[in-house]
């Protein structure tokens, strides 16, 4: 273990060895190999980064908006050039297959593209005449130092909807990546620096509780963006808000997919397999529950079981692999416990992913549990793994009632060609992101990303116009300019 590389924090444009007395292994979940070690940094290191970020903000916020945008555009170009390298890093430390990793890199690039539009996004409003000789203008200004807390499941896409936009709008940023997937951030830092970002504007501090609490408590940090589990998200929102910070916390999900009798069978099965088992189910937009109308249920489920049993499982770097590992051994054990709990509570296990035949890594195969009811633990909890619950329903109205009982409301999908059914679904379902005849309704960067109920805490969502509002505050100037002396 002596030759394992120890990662460093990135503060004021330099890689700085941590003062941490504890390091955690960063593991390739497909093999169990230790890739490097990440410091569990101290609160003092976070506070040091905050001082640096505040100093950098004073200068960066005064840089002309088009010039800031050019730095973001250069960053975007570098990301494109290094797309394959970035994708391989994601697969190495996260486990998702290379095709999915490439897709994640592309979504990250699109987020940077959106942020590069800062000159337009920063525009305010004005009214030439609100009274005699009086005009008003509304200006946007950056809020200051921003903190970001990112999850392991999208080590590029999620950070890239945080720091590029915040920085393009004139803020400085401190990011705490997941300690499980920190390697990719090293490369992003390198490329952002190469793009011309001044020292101190973007800082990275690895760690756990002390760093999170530092972000939430340090008075220099004015806003916090979080993506992760519901319990941590609640804590982040309550603690950050109590310390008078802006907070957006995107948390758990239990996304429902409704399959109606007129759905295209082959297309629906393909989409559900991808949505339920892609990225090992470790995404907040995964399909966790299918509610299927009785008329199509037998044919749909027979085809779904066959497709699930034919999924290729393995190392995401290998050709043809669809399903990679879950992130850690404890996640694997937790998932198996949920499957067994479902069977214990009366669900029918029709596709069993507990045994994959793979001797190394943390794998769980596609799992389907049928005859699920809303009082079961597997229906209530976010499992965050390739486990799909199935409920048969009589009609669309029942399917919507089932979905709306969940405490989560991130996304929901429907498969049908009935326009009336689609409209009913759109109006009645409780969820922030909806899909029609597609499995993962994750919107593009210029639309807001986030859910309702226990899937989100805050008022301003990630991405879209909401992100511009989140990272800026407004100043309205009302002025009187008498035209006396200029009369014709």
From Swiss-Prot:
Gene of this entry: iolA
Catalytic reaction annotation: 3-oxopropanoate + NAD(+) + CoA + H2O = hydrogencarbonate + acetyl-CoA + NADH + H(+); 2-methyl-3-oxopropanoate + NAD(+) + CoA + H2O = propanoyl-CoA + hydrogencarbonate + NADH + H(+)
GO biological process terms held by the UniProt record: inositol catabolic process; thymine catabolic process; valine catabolic process
InterPro entries in the cross-refs: Ald_DH/histidinol_DH, Ald_DH_C, Ald_DH_CS_CYS, Ald_DH_N, Aldehyde_DH_dom, MeMal-semiAld_DH, MSDH_GmP_bac
Domain of life of the source: Bacteria
Protein name: Malonate-semialdehyde dehydrogenase
Reported function: Catalyzes the oxidation of malonate semialdehyde (MSA) and methylmalonate semialdehyde (MMSA) into acetyl-CoA and propanoyl-CoA, respectively. Is involved in a myo-inositol catabolic pathway. Bicarbonate, and not CO2, is the end-product of the enzymatic reaction.
HAMAP family per the UniProt record, alphabetical: IolA
UniProt: NAD(+) binding residues: 150, 152, 176, 179-180, 229, 251, 382
EC number: 1.2.1.27
Family affiliation: Belongs to the aldehyde dehydrogenase family. IolA subfamily.
Pathway: Polyol metabolism; myo-inositol degradation into acetyl-CoA; acetyl-CoA from myo-inositol: step 7/7
Record's subunit section: Homotetramer.
Keyword list, A-Z: NAD, Oxidoreductase
Enzyme class at the top of the EC tree: oxidoreductase
Keyword NAD listed: yes
GO molecular function, one term: malonate-semialdehyde dehydrogenase (acetylating) activity
Organism whose genome encodes this protein: Listeria innocua serovar 6a (strain ATCC BAA-680 / CLIP 11262)
Active-site residues, record numbering mapped to chain: 284
